[in-house]
A protein has these predicted regions:
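Acidic, Ser/Thr/Pro/Gly-enriched alpha-helical scaffold modules and adjacent low-complexity linkers
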Residues: 1-375
């Protein structure tokens, strides 16, 4: 047994499924973060959704999985500096979940769909690396079954220990991935869009692979305001159409202010069943420095008094957006104090629609805010 409390199991279960209708048939990779809850914590939490019993495994495979998870849960001290415990939990540690969600039409099922998620749990906030890993593992697992998971477990056992500041090479189902690990809270330079299959172009482990310039496509002029809010520990609610969009947005905001640590708590994908829901949402005033990513429109009503609310769009040209696409906007109660770099912004607005310029534009934008934070 891995020593996961009932509260953590509930959180893992609810966090691993989109809290919105994303598509009829398709898959989605996203990430989330939940607080570790001590095993002796109160059991007063929402019930987890019913799930079929997991397939039986041989003792050797179970033992191997325990060892592989111990690697994925290693190096807690290299995680982003966390806030003090809140309300229900006495823990200051977090679990990161990297999820592959699959949905297919299936008329034989009561709801008409086959829906399952495969999740990698880790104490390491390496969103860039683990998104690449789960994106390879998920499709293979759902096509070939447990034999893929067993092969992956044996791969993980052979992974070297993650050393901050170095490039890590790991095998994933026959593919060798190279990832540049951050040195503490230092910013990682580059565009963050590499697949990691080349040692000369490694994955930036702490940076989402979806470009910053694409995630905030319609809101590029507002990045200066968001950067300022992150530095001054202002509460921010981010609402998007799916958990990949919101989780990438939150991760990018965390990356935007490196090497300054996040002053409060951040949740890339947050839902109403989270163990800390009351601590964040039902208070008269939101906690200082908390950043929540959500897909449920319920949060727009419940958190209407928050000082900064971001609604994300599709991340592409208006001509490609349908009627149901939400209008991208930021509602903020404070006045921006930092001046925009209008020259850079004008250039970014030209680059964002050019596929050949996307990598360069993303690298320039990330470098700009890294330098701005260092001043």
């Amino acid at each position: 047994p891995l020593g996961i409390s009932k509260e953590e199991k509930d959180n893992i279960a609810f966090s691993s499924f989109p809290d919105t209708h994303v598509f009829s048939d398709g898959d989605l990779v996203f990430s989330w973060r939940v607080r570790e809850v001590p095993l002796d914590a109160s059991n007063a939490s929402p019930p987890a959704p019913s799930k079929p019993a997991p397939p039986r495994r041989s003792p050797s495979v179970r033992e191997s999985m325990t060892r592989s998870v111990s690697w994925l849960r290693r190096s807690r001290n290299e995680a982003v500096v966390d806030a003090s415990p809140r309300l229900h939990s006495r823990s200051t540690s977090y679990l990161y979940g990297y999820t592959y969600f699959l949905q297919r039409r299936d008329t034989s099922r009561r709801r008409g769909y086959f829906q399952k998620s495969l999740v990698i749990l880790s104490h390491l906030p390496y969103v860039g690396l683990f998104h690449q890993v789960i994106a390879r593992l998920g499709p293979a697992f759902f096509e070939h079954g447990m034999v893929v998971l067993e092969s992956f477990v044996h791969d993980v056992i052979r992974w070297p220990s993650p050393e901050p500041g170095l490039t890590l090479s790991v095998s994933v189902l026959g593919t060798l991935l190279h990832a540049s690990l951050p040195h503490g809270l230092e910013a990682q330079n580059g565009d963050g869009m590499q697949s990691g299959t080349s040692a000369s172009l490694p994955i930036l482990a702490s940076v989402p692979s979806t470009p910053l310039i694409q995630v905030f496509y319609e809101l590029l002029p507002d990045l200066w305001r968001l950067w300022e809010c992150m530095l001054t520990a202002e509460p921010i609610l981010i609402v998007g159409r799916d958990p990949r969009t919101t989780s990438d947005a939150v991760w990018h905001l965390v990356d935007l202010i490196r090497p300054v640590p996040v002053a409060g708590d951040f949740r890339p994908f947050f839902h109403i069943h989270d163990y800390d829901f009351r601590a964040f949402v039902t208070r008269a005033t939101p906690p200082t420095g908390v950043v929540l990513g959500a897909t449920n429109p319920f949060f727009l009503q419940t958190c209407a008094t928050w000082p900064h609310i971001v609604q994300l769009g599709r991340g592409d040209k208006p001509a490609h957006q349908g009627r149901d696409t939400p209008t991208a906007r930021i509602v903020s109660s404070s006045k921006r104090r930092v001046n925009k770099d209008t020259t850079l912004l004008k250039q970014l607005l030209q680059w964002r629609d050019s596929p050949s310029q996307l990598e360069h534009a993303n690298a320039v934008l990330r470098r700009y805010f890294s330098d701005l934070t260092e001043r």
